[in-house]
């Protein structure tokens, strides 16, 4: 806070220049009007010094209106003008001058305070503190404080001193709070000084020791570098020797040692040396690498030759494989050579060719007996008590069975031998599985052609179906056995499958040839006569074939494919029917159509009776039944036409069906009204028809049964009789209704009476009730 100095108000207030108080500087213009407005609002309740001095002459600003202010202003101006004119205004001017001087000085001070860059909150706090202090003092103290004389100046200086002492007291209290900390800091200062002295001494010693240790470290570093370099050279030489050279003992093992684990370990090391020499070839001088490679290659090739020679020698003598140690060594040789296919394939081919030759020679001796074409003795692998397989003209089935059994035993022995060679009896060893299959197939391939030729020779000369089927069953059985033993891709398995096709084709050929012979043979054509019975050849044909088919338990005959099975069924069922129909159609013995239908029906009935027990022919049974049903319908129609002709109703039956065919579902008499226009449709004609009906039907059943005596199936006979009489009675009933409508005529016998005469009243009654 700025205080008004005493010197400001010490001068005398007279009319002269020396007696007048010095005028203050004009008030500062506040740059921001809004701030002055705000301060005026804040200080609205503050009492100005002028107001304090002139309490009697002024009023609060909030009680004076604007009009009153204007009036007061003009009134004062009028009074001042009068006083000047009368000369009485001198004293008032002096007082106004003093008051104006005080106000001007105070305004200057306030402007300086208010124009300071203080925030509103700070100013508010300052005035609040002043207000609190003024509230504690007496009213006269505030008046003395703002007094412009010596008293005011002294009051303000005292007030300023009080504020300063209070400020010093507050600052002293704050400093007293930091006094313990200052003491601690002084104690720390003493300790730090001691530490600094120790630090200086220590640094001096360290600097001296550092110079000495630097020299020592340099000497140690030189020694370590020399040691490391010497060790590196030593390690390089040792590593080079281990990586690129063989010692004398290892060379001895490869050149002259036994083939064992040590040999193969040393050989693997020699191969690694050979591979690692590629690094030496990248040097500026590759001569060292070339020399090492040449030497290692020489030793490796010599070792491989020893392995190949040992393997061929061991495989050439099968008895040597009884030694487990030799077999283990052979197994190691195979493991090593399996990555060198040229050597391995050469060994496998040599072994396969030698074993194939032995098997073929042994097979020929077994088939041909002790006789040898080349004059050579028996093989050492064949025992002296072995039984040769002789070809028997009377028992080809046994020969084929023995032949296949021998080949199967040979294949099993060879497969087990080769498996034991490559796996050493360990069934879980699958490393050489494909090789075992390949070698076994190559060895047994030599037997494929001889066995195929022998079996084809027997099958091609055999004419009995039963024998061929037995041979087929044997071949199929051994196909399963070979497949289980050798897999599905073996050459022997393919050969056996071809033999199955040969047997199937031969059976097809024999049946086809037999049917062709029957078709073209005159005796079979002449076998047809008026007794209308099936020919003997069909009985003989099925007596050979059906027992064979009946024994089959597979889904198809002879395990044929669905297409081939359908062809075979057509061959044994449809082809005989076709041949028989051709014979009947070209035979002039049968003059009546009814006889042709009956003999065909009897033939189909025989085939049906033969094929029903055979489950594989169930589809053909249905097909034959359909053929019989068609023939039955034709015979039924013939019998119906015969009855209509006997009764004189045949023409009327045709006329009515021309108008609208009869139907069990719908019948309306009015539909048949056009029949009246027909000339044959007269009452006299139906009188004659009625007489014929009465004359024919008492014996109609007996006559029809006699005409169907040659039909073998009683079921078909009953079906023909019932259906023909049923159709006639239905026609008879409907015709009687038409006659009643358009001729006023009815038959003597009703439809039920006719049905009773022929014994179908029950069936007819049920049919009427359904309708």
Curated annotation (Swiss-Prot):
It is a peripheral membrane protein. The keyword Membrane applies. Acts as a component of the peripheral membrane COG complex that is involved in intra-Golgi protein trafficking. COG is located at the cis-Golgi, and regulates tethering of retrograde intra-Golgi vesicles and possibly a number of other membrane trafficking events. The keyword Transport applies. It holds the Pfam family COG6_N. GO terms for cellular component: Golgi membrane; Golgi transport complex. Keywords: Golgi apparatus, Membrane, Protein transport, Transport. This is Conserved oligomeric Golgi complex subunit 6. Belongs to the COG6 family. GO terms for biological process: intra-Golgi vesicle-mediated transport; protein transport. It is found in: Golgi apparatus membrane. InterPro entries: COG6, COG6_C, COG6_N.
């Amino acid at each position: 806070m700025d205080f008004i100095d005493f010197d400001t108000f010490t001068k005398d207030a007279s009319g002269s220049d020396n007696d007048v108080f010095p005028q203050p500087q004009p008030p500062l213009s506040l740059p921001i009007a809004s701030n002055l407005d705000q301060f005026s609002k804040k200080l609205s309740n503050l009492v100005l010094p002028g107001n304090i001095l002139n309490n009697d002459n002024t009023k609060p600003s909030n009680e004076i209106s604007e009009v009153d202010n204007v009036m007061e202003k003009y009134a004062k101006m009028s009074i001042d003008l009068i006083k000047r004119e009368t000369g009485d205004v001198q004293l008032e001017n002096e007082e106004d001058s003093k008051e104006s001087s005080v106000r001007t000085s105070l305004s200057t001070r306030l402007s300086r305070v208010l124009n300071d860059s203080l925030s509103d909150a700070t100013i508010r706090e300052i005035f609040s503190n002043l207000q609190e202090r003024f509230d504690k003092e007496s009213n006269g103290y505030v008046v003395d404080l703002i007094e412009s004389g010596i008293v005011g100046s002294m009051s303000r200086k005292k007030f300023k001193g009080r504020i300063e002492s209070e400020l010093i007291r507050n600052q002293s209290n704050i400093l007293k709070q930091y006094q313990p900390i200052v003491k601690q800091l002084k104690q720390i200062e003493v300790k730090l000084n001691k530490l600094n002295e120790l630090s200086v001494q220590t640094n001096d010693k360290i600097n001296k020791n550092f110079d000495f240790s630097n020299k020592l470290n340099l000497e140690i570093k030189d020694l370590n570098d020399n040691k490391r370099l010497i060790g590196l050279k030593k390690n390089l030489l040792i590593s080079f020797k281990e990586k690129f050279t063989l010692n004398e003992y290892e060379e001895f093992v490869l050149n002259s040692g036994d083939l064992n684990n040590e040999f193969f370990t040393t050989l693997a090391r020699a191969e690694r040396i050979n591979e690692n020499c590629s690094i030496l070839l990248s040097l500026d001088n590759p001569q060292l690498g070339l020399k090492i490679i040449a030497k290692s290659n020489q030793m490796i090739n010599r070792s491989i030759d020893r392995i190949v020679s040992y393997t061929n020698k061991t495989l050439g003598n099968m008895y040597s494989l009884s030694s487990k140690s030799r077999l283990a060594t052979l197994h190691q040789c195979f493991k090593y050579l399996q990555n060198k296919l040229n050597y391995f394939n050469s060994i496998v081919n040599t072994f396969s060719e030698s074993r194939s030759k032995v098997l073929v020679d042994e097979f020929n001796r077994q088939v041909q007996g002790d006789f040898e074409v080349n004059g050579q003795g028996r093989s050492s692998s064949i025992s002296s008590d072995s039984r040769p397989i002789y070809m028997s003209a009377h028992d080809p089935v046994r020969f084929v069975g023995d032949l296949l059994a021998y080949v199967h035993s040979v294949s099993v022995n060879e497969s087990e031998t080769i498996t034991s060679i490559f796996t050493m009896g360990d069934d879980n060893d699958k490393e050489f599985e494909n090789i075992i299959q390949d070698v076994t197939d190559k060895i047994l391939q030599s037997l494929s052609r001889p066995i195929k030729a022998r079996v084809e020779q027997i099958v091609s000369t055999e004419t009995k179906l039963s024998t061929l089927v037995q041979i087929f069953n044997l071949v199929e059985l051994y196909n399963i056995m070979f497949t289980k033993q050798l897999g599905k891709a073996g050459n022997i398995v393919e050969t056996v499958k071809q033999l199955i096709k040969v047997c199937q084709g031969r059976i097809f050929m024999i049946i086809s040839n037999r049917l062709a012979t029957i078709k073209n043979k005159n005796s079979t054509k002449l076998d047809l006569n008026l007794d209308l019975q099936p020919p003997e050849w069909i009985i003989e044909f099925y007596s050979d074939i059906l027992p064979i088919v009946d024994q089959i338990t597979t889904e198809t005959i002879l395990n044929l494919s669905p297409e081939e099975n359908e062809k075979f069924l057509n061959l044994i069922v449809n082809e005989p029917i076709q041949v028989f129909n051709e014979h009947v159609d070209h035979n002039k013995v049968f003059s009546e159509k009814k006889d042709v239908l009956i003999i065909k029906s009897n033939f189909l009935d025989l085939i049906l009776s033969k094929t029903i027990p055979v489950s594989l022919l169930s589809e053909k049974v249905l097909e034959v039944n359909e053929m019989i049903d068609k023939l039955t319908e034709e015979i039924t129609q013939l019998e119906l036409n015969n009855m209509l002709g006997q009764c004189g109703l045949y023409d009327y039956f045709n006329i009515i069906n021309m108008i609208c065919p009869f139907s069990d579902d719908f019948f309306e008499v009015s539909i048949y009204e056009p029949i009246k226009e027909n000339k044959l449709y007269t009452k006299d004609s139906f009188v004659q028809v009625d007489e014929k009906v009465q004359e024919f039907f008492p014996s109609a059943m007996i006559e029809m049964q006699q005409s169907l005596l040659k039909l073998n199936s009683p079921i078909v006979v009953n079906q023909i009789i019932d259906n023909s009489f049923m159709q006639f009675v239905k026609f008879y009933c409907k015709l009687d209704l038409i006659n009643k409508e358009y001729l006023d005529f009815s038959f003597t016998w009703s439809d039920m009476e006719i049905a009773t005469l022929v014994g179908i009243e029950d069936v007819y009654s049920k049919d009427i009730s359904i309708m």
